[in-house]
């Protein structure tokens, strides 16, 4: 767990200036760059330019997160996308959980800049009926119990909050609505990793995404040994190698013969 005020290197933003292909990584709600840092370092080691920003309100205290909303988080990843697009010839966007939702929104609003999408346990909806009470509950209670640490592999720490700020959670549901509405705008190649046992994001989001996008090249990979934070779990090596192959495939044609 991330204690209040704790600051360690793994929760800081990560940037690597590599070759002409860039990858933007977006972390999830109440999480931090720590959940994606090994993935970022793997991609950097393969020569890609990498951006892993820290979303506003994250990596400090849950109270800080509760005074932010989805437009704040989106603007941060949007800046990173535009920065990568200035430095690179092609960009692939990837995300974990809410980060996957942000990645989809970037592809919807900046389609020409996004060559492909890699989503790990993305969330765009939920069957949890308790969320129906959020419009009122967010005004009565500041937070609820957190959902961090859903990792099967012992000894892993995603550096996330142990409380869920309810105003911020309500804002996230508004982002879900926008992304679901515009799913048909997604035409980019898409690789979706889904954990068979996920105790944070239920099974409703993946089929909504896969049936809603217009991508002719969309694939789902089921992870059998990992929980929600699969990027720190048993199947992380599969995600790292599979996403690297995906990035190479969707960017190779345009960049063939260019230095890496």
Q: Locations of the language-model features?
A:
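Short alpha-helix in the alpha/beta-hydrolase fold that links the catalytic acid
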Residues: 39, 188, 202-211
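Gly/Ala-rich beta-loop-alpha elbow adjacent to hydrolase catalytic centers
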Residues: 95-99, 103
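Active-site nucleophile loop of the alpha/beta-hydrolase fold
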Residues: 118-128
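Catalytic histidine neighborhood in serine/cysteine hydrolases
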Residues: 49-51, 207, 211-229
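Active-site nucleophile elbow and catalytic-triad environment of alpha/beta-hydrolase enzymes
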Residues: 165-183, 188
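Catalytic active-site module of serine/aspartate enzymes centered on a nucleophile-bearing elbow/loop
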Residues: 224-260
